[in-house]
C-alpha cells in the first residue's frame, strides 16, 4: 500500500495506491489523521483511482475520516473511476453520504464551489 498526500486550498488530498486491507488500514489511518489534524485542514479528497483492492477495513477507514472531517465542518469527497472499487463503495452505503467524482480536478472544483457558496 502506498500513500501520498498533498495540500491544495486548505484541503488534504490523499492518494492511495495498491491494496487497502486490514494489514494496511491502521497505519494508513494514522498517517492520514496526523496530516489532517496536524495541519489544520478543513476538507479532504480521497483519490482511490489507483487502488487495486479494498476490503471492509478500507470502508471503515473512509467512514472514520468522513466523521472526522464532518466534525470539523468540512467536506470529504472520493475520486474513483475503478468499477470494482465503486461497486464496493456503493454496496457499503458510503455513496449515500459521500459524493463520488471521476477525477481529482472535478472534485477540487466542487470543493471550491461549496466554499464559494457556503454549502
Model-derived features: positions:
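STAS-typified acidic loop motif
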Residues: 2-30, 48
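Generic detector of low-complexity/intrinsically disordered segments
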Residues: 5, 14, 63, 96-97, ...
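Amphipathic alpha-helical interaction surfaces in cytosolic regulatory modules
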Residues: 22-97
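Residue-level recognition of oxygen-bearing side chains
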Residues: 84, 103-106
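A charged, well-structured terminal subsegment
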Residues: 105-119
